[in-house]
């Protein structure tokens, strides 16, 4: 298993780095769209569609919608706002699982929820790539989320006692959340001090980082909730040793549109 994970990582890493940081404009949107389409193919299975026709049809639908959004940039703000609404709702659904299943258990509803997860993630990345310090922004959100993941892992291993959402993901603890949050805030503080941010800007950045990390946890738990309801361990086996695409990006699909929305609200990329 470890050998498989290493080989897969060595193959995918240069592709991912090249796609994220070397491609621009429509080529970048197409690259991210391909990744999101694979995620859509996996999501259709989480929604209850085992047959390839239904899964491919859903992925194609998501691809068409991404093309439409690319040609309708005036809708970007609405897409980010929709993401904020969705992740607020998703928090409630996770906290009330399994009682909440009655509201989202149907296949069509789950397909619709997939759109609310996948399309804003694509839109957020496309916007970040268009804004000042584009690659730096993409690195920033990834470092925030991955730094929080690392902090949560070690903190949870060392101190984890109180379960965060035992009916959704029994392995996660509140102590892990605190460790992840502390790691992300430490990263943000270090960057702010290095770049000489004002006290006001630093406080806003710390608040924003905390919100992004919280939402990334909700994103992770949301996919876990859908997998648990479907009786599925991994979203697919597309990435040997790593599971599926969604298993690798579940936290980022939530964090990216919220990160972009916060920057938009701060006037970073608004026209």
From Swiss-Prot:
It is found in: Cell inner membrane. Pathway: Phospholipid metabolism; CDP-diacylglycerol biosynthesis; CDP-diacylglycerol from sn-glycerol 3-phosphate: step 3/3. Its EC number is 2.7.7.41. It comes from the Bacteria. The chain crosses the membrane at residues 12-32, 53-73, 75-95, 111-131, 136-156, 174-194, 199-219, 251-271. It catalyses: a 1,2-diacyl-sn-glycero-3-phosphate + CTP + H(+) = a CDP-1,2-diacyl-sn-glycerol + diphosphate. GO terms for cellular component: plasma membrane. Pfam families: CTP_transf_1. InterPro entries: PC_trans. One of its GO terms (biological process) is CDP-diacylglycerol biosynthetic process. This is Phosphatidate cytidylyltransferase. Keywords: Cell inner membrane, Cell membrane, Lipid biosynthesis, Lipid metabolism, Membrane, Nucleotidyltransferase, Phospholipid biosynthesis, Phospholipid metabolism, Transferase, Transmembrane, Transmembrane helix. It is a multi-pass membrane protein. The keyword Transmembrane helix applies. GO terms for molecular function: phosphatidate cytidylyltransferase activity. It is an enzyme of class 2 (transferase). Belongs to the CDS family.
């Amino acid at each position: 298993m470890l050998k498989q994970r290493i080989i897969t990582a060595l193959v995918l890493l240069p592709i991912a780095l090249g796609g994220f940081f070397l491609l621009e404009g429509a080529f970048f949107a197409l690259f991210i769209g391909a990744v999101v389409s694979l995620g859509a193919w996996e999501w259709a299975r989480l929604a209850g569609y085992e047959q390839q026709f239904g899964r491919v049809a859903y992925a194609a639908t998501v691809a068409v919608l991404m093309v439409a959004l690319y040609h309708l940039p005036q809708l970007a703000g609405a897409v980010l706002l929709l993401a904020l609404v969705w992740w607020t709702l998703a928090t409630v659904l996770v906290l009330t699982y399994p009682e909440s299943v009655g509201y989202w258990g149907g296949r069509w509803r789950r397909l619709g929820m997939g759109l609310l997860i996948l399309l804003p993630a694509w839109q957020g990345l496309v916007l970040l790539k268009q804004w000042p310090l584009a690659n730096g922004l993409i690195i920033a959100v990834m470092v925030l989320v991955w730094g929080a993941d690392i902090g949560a892992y070690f903190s949870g291993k060392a101190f984890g006692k109180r379960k965060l959402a035992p009916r959704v993901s029994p392995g996660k603890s509140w102590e892990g959340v605190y460790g992840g949050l502390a790691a992300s805030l430490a990263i943000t503080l270090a960057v702010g001090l290095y770049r000489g941010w004002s006290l006001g800007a630093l406080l806003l950045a710390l608040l924003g980082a905390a919100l992004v990390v919280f939402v990334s946890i909700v994103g992770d738990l949301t996919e876990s909730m859908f997998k648990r309801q479907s009786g599925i361990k991994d979203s697919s086996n597309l990435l040997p040793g790593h599971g599926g695409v969604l298993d690798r990006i579940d936290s980022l699909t939530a964090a990216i549109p919220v990160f972009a929305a916060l920057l938009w609200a701060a006037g970073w990329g608004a026209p």
